[in-house]
Amino acid sequence: DRDAQTLTDERSDQGDGNFRYEFETSNGIYTQKTGTPGSEGQSNHQGSFRFTLEDGTIAEVTYIADEYGYQPSSDLLPVPPPAPPHVQRLLEIAAEQRAQGITFD
């Protein structure tokens, strides 16, 4: 959108790995994130972004990125179906066996 105006553009960097960033335009694009030093030497990020889809609905994603990887969350992301009952039962049995100290190589 050529006519979009920047409404917000705020940046703060402490220089020690801590930072905050926020950006918003008049056409509905928005992003914000914060960062902190991570326990494994990485930079931990937490944030969100949103934009308007062609049908007028708002797409929004929140996320965490840390030593466990990128972990997005959104109603737009596909969700796998639940495991069938027999698989759920097998997982319960495995958890019970681990609690009893049983291990499998």
UniProtKB/Swiss-Prot annotation:
Any Gene Ontology CC annotation: chitin-based extracellular matrix
Domain called Chitin-binding type R&R: residue spans: 16-81
Taxonomic superkingdom: Eukaryota
Tissue: Arthrodial membrane.
Name of this protein: Cuticle protein AMP1B
Disulfide pattern: none
Location of the region described as Disordered in the Swiss-Prot/TrEMBL record: 1-21
Stored Pfam families: Chitin_bind_4
GO molecular function list: structural constituent of chitin-based larval cuticle
Lineage of producing organism: Eukaryota, Metazoa, Ecdysozoa, Arthropoda, Crustacea
Keyword GTP-binding in annotation: no
The keyword Methyltransferase is assigned to this record: no
Keyword terms: Cuticle
UniProt source species: Homarus americanus (American lobster)
